[in-house]
Amino acid sequence: MADLSSLKDLGTAQEASAPVHVRKVDAQGRAYATGKRKNAIARVWVKPGTGKITVNGRDFPVYFARPVLQMILQQPVVAAARTGQFDVIATVTGGGLSGQAGAVRHGISKALTYFEPGLRSVLKKGGFLTRDSRVVERKKYGKAKARRSFQFSKR
């Protein structure tokens, strides 16, 4: 049977092991994070600024021409109600445009939580901090695609 002092120790041990989210910023005052989606990997830096988003050295409307992809990029900043307060610099490699947009969104979300830990609950609730692990299913031999079989002829 556990005595009272061991129960107190257990409580303090649990408090100590709970993750404390601290601000992680480099010497220039930027928060860095990586985001992933499908085969795309994005390296993202967030710093206080005017709301400019740069992807691979180009403004994001130039790099991501489709309005849907532009909206995906802005979702975390809008959800956190920080529009026009942060400059974002991202370099993204691999995958297609949709995967790259998702990777940058994931990176922006993580970097915002490193810069301002208070935003974590809002972004977590919106699902921006969760890594979307869905990737293309591989093609199997004996099949036309991943699941589609070759046409079957009875006679």
From Swiss-Prot:
Establish whether keyword Cytoplasm is in the entry: no
Q: Which domain of life is it from?
A: Bacteria
What pairs make up the disulfide bonds? Answer: none
- Please give the InterPro entries that the UniProt record associates with this protein: Ribosomal_Su5_D2-typ_SF, Ribosomal_uS9, Ribosomal_uS9_bac/plastid, Ribosomal_uS9_CS, Ribsml_uS5_D2-typ_fold_subgr
Q: Which Pfam families match?
A: Ribosomal_S9
Instruction: Tell me yes or no: is Repressor among this UniProt entry's keywords.
Output: no
Please list the GO terms describing molecular function. Answer: RNA binding; structural constituent of ribosome
Key words of the record: Ribonucleoprotein, Ribosomal protein
Tell me which family the UniProt entry assigns to this protein: Belongs to the universal ribosomal protein uS9 family.
Q: What is this protein called?
A: Small ribosomal subunit protein uS9
- The species this protein belongs to is Allorhizobium ampelinum (strain ATCC BAA-846 / DSM 112012 / S4)
